């Protein structure tokens, strides 16, 4: 089975990986996808290893935005999904308040075991998604 799938500069893990050495180049992203990374020798990270949450959806008119998905969980715990926003209120006379944007999902978990970590330009990131924008007021 394949360890990774690739789309442009983004490599996505499909299972736990056991590597002798692993190098992530500049301007390259490894989406850990909630799986573990074991490196017997050196992990050289000049790109990004990440498992971010996803952004919440925007409110539309007086309808609530949806919550964003949490970071992926493969063999590790997934991030928590964000909750949906509230519906816009209604005032006598017909004015509707805008719906609230959904909350972003939390980042997932990253697990790395390596004898040596190297690289000066890379990073490891588990970041929550942004909240969605509120909807517009309706007359």
Regions found by a protein language model. Name each.
Residues 1, 34, 40-139:
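Glycine-centric low-complexity/flexibility signal
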């Amino acid at each position: 089975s394949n360890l990774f799938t690739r789309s442009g500069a983004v490599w996505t893990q499909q299972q736990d990986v056991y590597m002798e050495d692993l190098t992530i180049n500049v301007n390259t992203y490894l989406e850990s996808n909630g799986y573990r990374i074991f490196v017997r020798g050196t992990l050289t990270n000049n790109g990004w290893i990440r498992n971010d949450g996803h952004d919440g959806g925007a409110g539309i008119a007086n309808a609530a935005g949806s919550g964003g998905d949490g970071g992926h969980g493969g063999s590790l715990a997934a991030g928590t999904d964000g909750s949906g926003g509230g519906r816009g209120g209604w005032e006598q006379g017909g004015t509707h308040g805008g719906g609230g944007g959904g909350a972003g999902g939390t980042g997932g978990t990253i697990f790395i075991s390596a004898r040596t970590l190297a690289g000066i330009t890379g990073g490891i990131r588990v970041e929550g998604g942004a909240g969605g924008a509120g909807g517009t007021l309706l007359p």
